[in-house]
Amino acid sequence: MIKNLHVTHFPLAPWQVVEPDRTLRLVLRVASGMIQRVECLNCDPCDTELDASGAMLPRLEAIEVPLTYNDSEFEYYVLKKRMETHKLRYHFVLYSLEGTFVLDERGVTQSAEERLIRPFFVSFVFDDAPQPAPAWAKDMIWYQIFPDRFRRGAGKANWNSDPITDRNAYFGGDLKGIRDAIPYLKKLGVTGVYLNPIFAAGSVHRYDTIDYRAIDPGLGTEEDFVRLCDALHENGMRIMLDGVFNHGSWKSLEFQDVAERSVASPYLDWFKMTDPDAVKSFVSGGYVGRSPYNTFAFAPDMPKWNTQNPAVAEHLMEAAEYWTKRCAVDAWRLDVPDEIHPSFLREFHARMKQLNPNLYIIGEIWSDPTRWMSEGLFDGVMNYPVYFAIRDFFLLRSIDAVQFCDRLTRYFALTPESWQEGMFQFCSTHDIPRILWYAKGNRKSVLNCYQMSSLFPGGISVYYGDEQLLSGGFDPDNRRCMPWNRVGREPFAAELFEQIHLLRRGRVKSISPINDDSIEIRLQDGQLPVCMSR
C-alpha cells in the first residue's frame, strides 16, 4: 500500500517556499485516488511543553491541507500558512481507506510516535527574503522589437518581408523608426516595448556587444535613444532593454588588448583563456580549430566574460546603471543568465533595485527556473515551460489534451503565486520560429496560442509582426522585416489585441481535457469557464 501512494515532497523549493509576504507554501503530491485527507502537523521547533510523564513534546497544530490541483496521475495538496515565527517543523499525516500514514524525513511510514518522528524543517526565514515582482509587471502587454527589422526612420527606402537566409544582412531599422511607430503601438494597446540589443556591436543581432556605453551607430545616437524613451513614457509605455552580460565581442577594446599583448594585458582575467598566446593567431587566422578561450555557444566572435572578476562585474554594472538612470529604463532582460555566475546576478539585482525598487528584471531561462527564482535573482523569467506546452498542443500536435493539461497543472502546482506574477509569457521571439510558421499559416491557431498565453499570470509579449501575420522559420528567418504595407488592411491585428486585452482580465484556476483536442479552462473569481479546441 505504501508504495502505491507515490508520495512526493521535499523540504526545498518548489515544494517548500516562503513567499515574500511570509506565507509558507507546502506542496504534497500523491497518486490519484489513494488519499482521502491530508493534515500537516506543525509548530515552531522551540515551542514545546511537558506532558504528564515529564516528556518534552512539541505544541503541534493540525491543519487540514486542501486538495488544490489534480492531473491524470496525481493529486496536489497545497498548504498556505502564515509564518508567525522564523522557523517551523512539520510532518504530514495521510488518511486513506487502508490506514493512516506519516510522511516525514524518513519517508512514508505508519509510525506516528513523536519520539520516532523526523520532521521536515523550514530553515530560519530572514527579513531580507526575495521580494515579489513590481506590481505593474503582471498587467503588462509587451511588444518585442528586433531593431534592425522593425522600422526605418523617415526618408529611408521601403523594405519587404521576404524570407531571410543571410544571417548578416542589414535592413536599416533604427531608433527613430521605432519612435515614429509609437502611435501604431498605442492604438494596439501596447503598454511596454522590449528591445533586443541596441548597444554598439559587430553584427545585426547585436548580441556581440563592443561598447556597452554607446548606442550602435546603425540604430542612431544616444540622443535618439533618450528621445525614444521619453516618447514612450509620455505615451504611457515602459521600456525594457536586453542586457547581454554573459559574453561580449572579439572586437571589444578589452579582448583586442588580450589578443595583442597576451599575458601582459591587464584584461587577461576579464575572459576565460585556455591559451592566451594563441588568441591573436586564432582570430587573425579566421577562427580555425578550437578556440583558445571560452565563448558563447562555440561562437568565436563572442568571448565569455569572466563575471566572477570584480572588475568585469563593475564594468558591466556601471553601464546598466548609466542607462537605467539616463533614460529611466523600466526593465532589463538578461541574456543567457544560466551561464553567468550567481554572484554577478545577485549584485546586479541588488544594485538595480537600489536605483529603482520598481525596476523589473527577468532572465532568459529555458527550463525549470526554481534555482534562480528561489534565490530571488530575478522577478521572473521567460516562461518557456508554458510556451513549449502551448506549442506542442496547439501547433505541433505532439501531445493530446490530457498531456497538455497535465503539464500546465504541474506548472500551477509547483510554481508559487508570487513567481507566477512576474513571469514573461510569449508565443514568438527572435530565438524560436514564429508562431504563424509553426501554425502553417493557420491564423486560428495563432489566435488560440495567444489567447491561452494571455490567461496566465504575468506580462505577455507580442513579437513584432505577429499581429500582421508575419511568418518566419528558424533564425535568421524569424527576423524578417515588419510588413508595414499590411497595416490598416489586415484585421487580424485588432482581433488579436482585443482578445489579449479581454483575456488578461481572467486567470486560470484549473484546466482539464474534454477530449483529445479540446480543453476546459476554469477561471478564478467565479468567471465563466473557457473552452478551446485546436
Residue positions per predicted region:
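Conserved, mostly hydrophobic/aromatic
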Residues: 28, 145, 185, 195, ...
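Active-site-proximal helices and loops of the catalytic beta/alpha 8
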Residues: 229-238, 247-262, 325, 335-418, ...
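Glycan-association/targeting regions that enable binding to alpha-glucans and other polysaccharides
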Residues: 1-138, 191, 355
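Active-site groove signature of glycoside hydrolases
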Residues: 245-247, 315-342, 425-430
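Substrate-binding/active-site clefts of carbohydrate-active enzymes
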Residues: 140, 146-191, 198-321, 326, ...
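Loop/helix patches that line or flank the sugar-binding groove of alpha-linked glycan CAZymes
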Residues: 137, 153-171, 181, 406-409, ...
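Hydrophobic faces of well-ordered beta-strands that scaffold small-molecule active sites
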Residues: 141-143, 193-195, 239-241, 332, ...
